[in-house]
């Protein structure tokens, strides 16, 4: 297993990246190339900082005061082994975890769903920006609650 992930940044406090006040950890790299993406500057793989899963957990533990974390990017699902390892460590520390992906719900592996509490899905579509969803950039994106690995309902 690859225990080094490509990392873009960390925000200690955000009210826009999932339910409640959360911290946000950004994976580096995304091949979706959504026109108008607000994180396009972190899309090209190979340009991010390489850190170990252990270093990522230490960074999150030090900066996330309320145990609510959103994993975003880039596209976290493009580093699946590293994502699983990080989510497993965070779950073991009782974090409330939200995963942001530009993919559809069916692209989120079951073993990833087992490790998270929320998932935001959908590509950013600039023509669908309407401001109705506080957790997404366009109206085709949705936030779902996940309970025991099962998607239970759409939150937004």
What are these regions (language model features)?
Residues 77-88, 129-156:
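P-loop/Walker A phosphate-binding loop and immediately adjacent motor/lid segment at beta-alpha junctions
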Residues 117:
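Receiver (REC) domain switch/active-site residues of two-component response regulators
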Residues 6-33:
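N-terminal pre-triad scaffold of radical SAM enzymes
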Residues 11, 120-123, 147:
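Residues at the C-termini of beta-strands that transition into short coil/loop
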Residues 101-103, 122-124:
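Short secondary-structure boundary segments
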Residues 2-8, 21, 39-99, 105-111:
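Conserved Radical SAM active-site core
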Residues 15, 110, 133-135:
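Short secondary-structure boundary/capping segments
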């Amino acid at each position: 297993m690859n225990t080094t992930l490509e990392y873009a940044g960390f925000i200690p406090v955000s009210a826009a990246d999932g339910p409640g006040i959360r911290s946000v950890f950004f994976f580096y790299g995304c091949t979706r190339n959504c026109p108008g993406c607000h994180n396009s500057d972190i899309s090209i793989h190979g340009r991010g900082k390489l850190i170990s899963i252990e270093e990522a957990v230490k960074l999150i533990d030090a900066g996330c005061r309320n145990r609510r974390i959103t994993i975003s990017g880039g596209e976290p699902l493009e580093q699946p082994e590293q994502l699983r390892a990080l989510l497993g460590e965070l779950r073991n520390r009782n974090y409330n975890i939200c995963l942001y992906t530009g993919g559809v719900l069916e692209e989120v592996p079951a073993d990833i769903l087992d490790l998270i509490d929320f998932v935001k899905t959908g590509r950013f579509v600039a023509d669908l920006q309407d401001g109705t969803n506080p957790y997404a950039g366009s109206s085709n994106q949705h936030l779902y609650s996940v309970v025991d690995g099962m998607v239970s309902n759409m939150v937004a």
